[in-house]
Amino acid sequence: YSILAMLFPCRMTILGDRMQTMDEKQQDVTRFLPKIFDRKVRKLEMNKSYRNTVEIAEYARALSGDQELELLMRHGKGVTEQTFVSKEALLDQVLIDVNLEKYETVAILTLTEEDALTVCQILKDRGENYHYIDRNTSAFEKGLTVTTFYLAKGLEFDQVFTAFFHRDNPLYKQAAYISATRALHELFVCQT
């Protein structure tokens, strides 16, 4: 923000979801923005969720602890949480669930790039079609997408599967929240 203030000495609109901060604790940037921009900052809170079904939004709200979030009353399937004995077993179930609904956009979201590449290799070995999104990807395609939770920020998918192999990761809670908020219609929280 300091660099932006120096490069662009103008009025700015900064939008974001404080629950999606990429560190171990949620930070409200409006607390330190006045110091950076050396002026008064006007804060508007938008608390209505339009993206997800009620079931997914309630799940995300429980993860974040943000009880002020107002939900759009569009109901869908409940969130499915499953633990698997192996990565392969997890992906077996993901592929079954993907083929049941035939959504246009489906994502398998992982904690790390290494995990995403592992998922890609397993899918490739099984002859599955998928798209991998990394830092250099410039286009979004329909179908099955594999990427990390942090590269999925700003994207939305009809159906989302988390493939979390490391629950002890300090970013687990943020990863779970960000992944949940990417899902429009169905969310499967899968881990080993």
Predicted regions and their residues:
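Conserved helicase motor core of SF1/SF2 NTP-dependent helicases
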Residues: 1-192
